[in-house]
Amino acid sequence: MAHKISSDDRSGGTTNLEWILDNWIELGADPAKLNLGLAAYGRSFKLNDPNSHGYRAPCTETWNGSGKHSGAAGRFTREAGYLAYYEICEKLQNGWTEVWLDEGKVPYAHGDGDWVGYDNIKSINYKVDMAKTYGLGGLMWWTTAIDDFNVSLVQLDDVILNLFQGYILWAGEISIDDCSKKQLA
């Protein structure tokens, strides 16, 4: 989920993380009882036009059983529209392009006619800082089950340990390997 982006106004500005947190708190929720979820996967879509790949680019919508996600299935996850973070890293190493959407503080990637939205280390750091700023009760990571714990580009358990250690100790940036440093077998 992105942070506030000007094009969110098309949906009444209610689809970004800040609005959601502000709304819960305004309605009386205790921030210390709210947890922020972080994703170790991305949702992908088939672009209508591979040359038009920006934020909210037109995509083919196909119901795959868990939502309208029409991107190609991952090599390991094998579900259309669902890519584990290590599969996204593999695609980036094989020619996909990562784009940082500064306004939303999130990345997306595109290649082979597909588009995927996901979190990377930079966006996760930003969300951890946001959780600290709002005084949230904690963080939740979904899911370690999609890490292969053997050949992945980024061992997600390392990310999780650094993430939670940093949150608990109010430490600085998460420090781990990025996608460019390891290869899938």
State where each predicted segment sits.
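Hydrophobic, secondary-structure "cap" segments at the distal end of domains
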Residues: 69-135
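Active-site rim elements
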Residues: 5-12, 21-22, 111-121, 140-145
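Aromatic-rich peripheral "rim/lid" segments of glycoside hydrolase catalytic domains that contact
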Residues: 88-91, 130, 145-185
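Conserved, mostly hydrophobic/aromatic
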Residues: 36, 131, 139
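Structured segments of extracytoplasmic/periplasmic soluble domains
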Residues: 20-27, 127-134, 183
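Stable alpha-helical elements in mature extracytoplasmic
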Residues: 13-20, 120, 124-127, 153, ...
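Conserved beta-strand elements of beta-rich interaction domains across eukaryotes
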Residues: 41, 123, 146-147
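Substrate-binding surface in catalytic domains of secreted glycosidases
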Residues: 1-83
